[in-house]
């Protein structure tokens, strides 16, 4: 029978190969910056690339009621899976999508959009995206959304 370990010890060489399975170290929650978010929003990184050929980043993002992102886009698109509360996602055409726990919304590469918690409940989603060819261009941040854009009455 194999022994179950919470975190396997490093090999005698002191280094692990990329193929070694490991428990990821827990990272502290980060409050997102006001230049990119309005209201209180926290991010917990779930997974990030280990090697140069990996692109996927996964994070749990928690929004206080009414909190929202600024307009932004992603070089390779983004998947967002709502896990708690009611989310509002909007695009430049004025479309507002209300997304509930268990639903996933996809934003194609380059589409300018925002995500937000509805005005009266906390919202949490899992964000999944791949880095752009130049990681600095993975997300392009733009101006803050207006209340009219948030409400879909622009």
Model feature map: region roles:
Residues 79, 106, 120-140:
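A short hydrophobic beta-strand segment most commonly corresponding to one strand
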